[in-house]
């Protein structure tokens, strides 16, 4: 039994429920009446008939009142003091606090807060070399640096604490560069750039940072040599990945992947991957398993396992895949007549259960495969 047994429309299903407003609705004019048009009896006039000398800005609506902080005169004085400094208004008594009009000197009431940039009279910095509130970079007249390592000369600017450096401009020579505390450096070292393990004879001119490079490489601008020998370093060369140096001396060449050097001396050739030398004499398309007698002719379609007798002719119309030359025409006739021995598309393999009338084809294939294997062994040597 499902949990919800009621209809979805029964939203308010209790006993004393009148469904009339939900089903039929109600008319608001029937229940509340029609709205009456505006008239002088029911509506206020648009402009209030109050005299003009009545001030709405006053906090209390009386003709005689105390001068308010929100009055026009006080507001004008307050707002004009923000943009440009004016003398203090006469009617405001001098308040004994820090609150003063900005831009004027505060009366030294309580606290006498020293404005930043003014010279403090004498403020004793407490703590570990606590500094007085002066401008950074100015020399304080008297800074009594208490704590360990506090210095009392005038040259000591904020130099308290263990090995604290004097805060001077970097590049100037400080007056006394003997660092108080531990680890003070001498003054001549701050004029140099920090040398990370570089020797001083490398410091003479601008050089790129040498990470472990020898100094004879450091004489002129060179590209970083990662393990290249120095005779390769003389001119701009492309990176040689295992090529011998006499190949690099002859000029710009494409990278040779296992090509012999007598292949390198000719003009532009396509990269030969393991081809023998006599194949590379002229521009030849890549031969996939073709014999060398096939390579000597002009443009031919690629022969996949064709015999050499077929390759001696010119461009043939239909590529024969693994068939002999003598039984080419009668094989085509038999395939057109649909004799069942369809050797088309067999790609050099005999179908199972086919006729064994082409043993000479097997001999040719075996001889071609043996010749291809012998040439590949020669290339490996």
Swiss-Prot record:
Give residue numbers for the modification (Phosphoserine).
339, 346, 357
User: Biased-composition ranges for Basic and acidic residues?
Assistant: 166-175, 186-237
The UniProt keywords, alphabetically, are:
Phosphoprotein
Residue ranges with Basic residues bias: 364-374
Q: Which InterPro entries match?
A: PLDrp1-like
Recorded GO molecular functions are:
mRNA binding; phosphatidic acid binding
Q: Where is the composition biased (Acidic residues)?
A: 9-18
Q: Where is this region: Disordered?
A: 1-20, 36-381
Q: Specify the protein name.
A: Uncharacterized protein At5g39570
Species name for this entry?
A: Arabidopsis thaliana (Mouse-ear cress)
